[in-house]
Amino acid sequence: MGKINISESRDFFVRDGERFFYLADTCWSVFTNASFDEWEYYLEYRRMQGFNALQINILPQHDRSESSNYIDPFELTPTGDWDFGKLNEKYFDRAEKMVELAVKRDFVPALTILWCNYVKGTWGSKITPSKIIPIEYIESYVEYVVDRFGKYNPIFIVSGDTNFETNEAIEYYLTALEVVKRKAPYSLTTMHLMGGLWILPEVFIKSPNLDFYMYQSGHSKERQTLSFELAQKFYSLTVKRPIVNGEPCYEGHSHGGKYGRFNNFDVRKAIWQSLLSGAKAGTAYGAHGIWNWHVKGRKFLGEYIQGCLMTGELL
């Protein structure tokens, strides 16, 4: 399959001369959690359902579930911390094999490079402070992952759950965008934002390295109008780009940490509201238990995060 491009009208994608609708499933945690048997079963099932893209976090998802398949992405220091100057080839061999299996089934890998907990100056940096990647290692890390995965024609999602609250964080993401476009100029780029966010720093709006907008309408029961409100906000920006709701409410996810869970009707409603309000380039779907790759009897590592978000401890 050919590379994905932006349409001349700059509001949808094109591949092999035909319109390409981005229909992604969210499986952030597969590189650390899934066995290869599970992964191949999943790929066949999602292909049968009609999905054509997969959203994956390159580094370990902080709120994944526990797994016996976990491998650290960096070599360890004598104290057990990550050595950011030494990437773990075993981890990336496994990750690349999983991407290869997905691409053989015609999936587009949408790979997140820097989730906010790995970036200094973000709200997420308080979650795993020992795993913040120093800025001096960002260029070499991004060069490595682009070299590893670029041949599979991925979409690179440069950020994860970010809200650009500091100049430090902005520097990380600008550096990552520049490296991606320098190393893989034909790969599309976007940014996964914190739920409800639509105000991007002007430097990103004007950047030639950002190819399309992605927003998150999120998992708050009281704020489900964000599915169409954010689409309209992005559609009104001065620089026109395709728009995707990359994280509508997940099926089975709690109502923002409150009692009750989103069902399939809620998900369909959020997606249709997004598409009909300007986010017409595509959408993602997420199922609770799949994005964090949960196995019965294992611990949910995100329980602590939900509690802290509700109390404001991390914000």
Predicted regions and their residues:
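Structured core elements
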Residues: Q55, D72, V244-N245, T283
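Solvent-exposed polar/charged
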Residues: D147, R182, S236-L237, L276
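Active-site mouth of glycoside hydrolases
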Residues: G2-F212, Q216-Q224
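Short glycine/serine/threonine/alanine-rich loop segments
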Residues: F51, F107, P154, R241, ...
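Generic recognition of flexible, low-complexity loop/linker segments
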Residues: V145, P201-E202, A231-Q232, A270-I271
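Active-site clefts of carbohydrate-active enzymes
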Residues: T162-N163, G196, L210-G218, E229-K269, ...
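Aromatic- and carboxylate-lined catalytic core of secreted/periplasmic carbohydrate-active enzymes
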Residues: E251-H253, F265-L315
